[in-house]
């Protein structure tokens, strides 16, 4: 719950409106129950958006939100649904008007130009995302054994020129489109900018705060 409190604090509102979007799991019910269990403990107004049940009026709901919180799951399927409903453009408008955009896994990479995803069962892939924030992002950097070698491979193949690589139990706070700092809520976890220098991967850790 520590990082969720941190997300709420970024709104600078006493009682922020926060909206959970669990599209990447097909609007999984237990995910929504967990969300409300956590956020009803805090001083906020939690809501959510379904796309696989009857969907609320997005054009009126999104502009009212101080924070958007996106769950993990299948990034490719999530973005396809959002585009079909026009949510991508509504979120862009909200972002440009100062709404805090946040999320985990698929909900973290979706804001960037590109993300490293396991949406396809057979392999990791670099996929285009919303492009609100410059850069390429990889979650689960230390949690899933295939992640670090894949980042090294796509760097060496010149498919990407850097990767904002985020370990488990860590968040990357992006401020004004620029990575601001890592937020560690685990045991000595960090986020890195991985680049290729003289043929070898260099991982530069971001400045970090510990919660």
Q: Where are these predicted regions, by residue range?
A:
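Class I SAM-dependent methyltransferase SAM-binding "motif I" and its flanking Rossmann-like core
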Residues: 79-81, 85-148
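A conserved C-terminal secondary-structure "cap"
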Residues: 177, 182-211
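Flexible gly/pro-rich beta->alpha loop and the following alpha-helix that scaffold active-site loops
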Residues: 47-100
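Short, small-residue-biased leader/transition segments that mark boundaries at the very start
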Residues: 2-3
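Short, charged/polar "capping" segments at the starts of alpha-helices
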Residues: 26-30, 145-146
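Conserved anion/nucleotide-ligand pocket segment
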Residues: 132, 137-185
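Nucleotide donor/acceptor-binding cores
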Residues: 13-17
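Short helix-loop-beta junction
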Residues: 35-46
